[in-house]
């Protein structure tokens, strides 16, 4: 259940989320070799069973009742050209199990988590009326710069490693201090010609630098910061760079890279090209690399609109490391245009 409201004359926004459920873990009784994946990313040999790893870690498959309530207050305000929004978050989670097999020293079944932080951002722009290029399809240029910062400190009375992770958005809550510095550059132009002119984001460059306190628990080989809910972030000092270039109305290119500052390596990278051949057909090519699992994948996709309501997407994936097909996916989508 979600409840949102404004209080104190609209100066403070309140958002409450509550959930209750009966959850359990189900373990895969197969090996990485049988699933066609590399076990290195899971700390396994190719012939080790996933179920044995879970059992050795103290995880069980019994049903558990769980209740979780999250309350957030935010007070956005304008300080000159800067938008500032301090926020306060509290969360209570209860289970009908203390998970003593996973963590013998942990005897509590109710966790209290709290955090406070601030978000701030501003925007500056400049218009270049004299920019014209038939080659790059540019007609004037607006350059917008959006610097931002998000900082948060949180604590909990139960460490996230002492409870099994049924749901990463409930059990896996980060504690400690985290700061994200962001800089977004957006270049806009006019495209479409007389009578059809429209504003287009021709190039977007988004740079994020994330750093945290030394006591943050790192649970993922690829760090990630989630600005709208920092407690769900994957800890680790890193730089994330994304880029999107709309070459023309039919061709677009995207790229992403996550550089792990703790390990001094490129943890994840991706590059893609999308081509819209007609209103009915779109194709794309995407390359993805993940350092931890030594994966290098190449995916080619065809999306065809069969009718106004049906479309089909075919996505074969090639493993560049093994020089063999990894998977072939087929997705059929049915739209309901009359349903709002």
Identify what each model region corresponds to:
Residues 1-340:
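Outer-membrane beta-barrel proteins and related beta-barrel translocases across Gram-negative bacteria
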